[in-house]
Structures are given as structure tokens and as C-alpha cells.
Amino acid sequence: EAIKMDVRQKRNKVLGERVVKALESRNMDAYYAETKEEAVKKALEWIPEGSTINMGGASSVHECGLIDAIKSGNYNFCDRDKASTPEEKQEIARAAFSCDWFLGSVNAMSEDGVFINIDGNANRVAAYAFGPKNVLLIVGMNKVVKTQEDAMSRARNEAAPVNAQRFGIDTPCSKAGSCFDCKSPECICCQILVTRFSRQKGRFKIILVDENLGF
């Protein structure tokens, strides 16, 4: 078992470092972390104290421990979970467009550094595309696939059904486990964003992590 893990770590490191170079060629900053702890350390090196931070719904950011570190540090964290009304939640989501740092992940990423994100409300993909000064993404190596076509398939047939189940949403994919290209009223695949380049150099900062994170 230890040998199997060691071989997998070697494979992920070689692949991860190649993906880092691919992301850098797309005008983004990228880093490969072998552990969640290393990922959090790197993220906090990037984010200056006193920064205003917002986020989309991203399990990966919670799972690696970054949110706990930010909440216990000297940052202005806009926490949607503390909103007491739907209106307040919307207000916090809209504040993302003027924040210093927006945190999130991806639904899938190809080995050549293109990533796919699918949203229902679209607050996350909107902020990735425009607004926040910096976008920091935590991406487990479980989300890296060979091609852009594979990335789209992973986003729609793996990530979306799991997220629909996670939120208790009544869609065909939540019942059957894969995408039916539905037009259900509760569809969470309303907006699909393909990110292939950053016009603003270094606006995207991506930490690849040798862990299974998110969905």
C-alpha cells in the first residue's frame, strides 16, 4: 500500500509540475503543493493581511483548511454563511466583484491548463470572469484530466450530479448519476465558463494539491 501511494505521489508530482507550466503559459501564477498544509501556507503567502476576501461555493477551499486559517487571521472575510436573509446573502455575493481576493476551485482542468466551471446561480463563474482583483483556486489532482473534452465531461457527468445530490436538487442527474442535458427548473448547469487565458497577468493564482479535494 505504501509503495502504491509513493508511486502515485511521484506520478502526481510529475504531472502537477507540467500542469503548473501550462497554467503559467496562460498568464497565470501556479504552484504545486504535496499536502493540504503546504497549499494553505502558499495561499497565505500570496494573500496579504487586511485583504477583503470573498468566495464561491467550493468544498476544496474548506477541506484544505484555508477558510479556517483565514477566519482566525487578520482578514476581512465576507462570509455568506453568516447571512441571516436571502437579501443579505445576495449582497455578500455581489460584493465579490470588488473584493481583493476571490477563493474557489474548478469543476475540472485539462493537462494543458484549461479549466471548466459550471454554475446554477453563476455568482462564482461571474467572479472568475470579471471583478475581483485576484482569484485564488485550490485544485485537487483528482480534478485534472487529459484533454479539454475530458474536462467538460468530468464537469457535467461527475461534478454536477454530485453537487446536485449534495444540495438536494431535483434534477435528472441527481437521480441517475450523469448528465441528461436537462432544462429542469432546478438545473445547476445554467452557465458554463471555459477559462483558457488571463489577460491580467497573475490575476489567477492556482494551487494544485496532491490530495482528493472537492467533487
Predicted regions and their residues:
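Conserved phosphate- and dinucleotide-binding cores of soluble alpha/beta proteins
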Residues: 97-215
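N-terminal glycine-rich FAD/FM-binding segment characteristic of electron-transfer flavoproteins
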Residues: 8
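Short, Lys/Arg-enriched N-terminal segments with co-localized hydrophobic residues
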Residues: 1-4
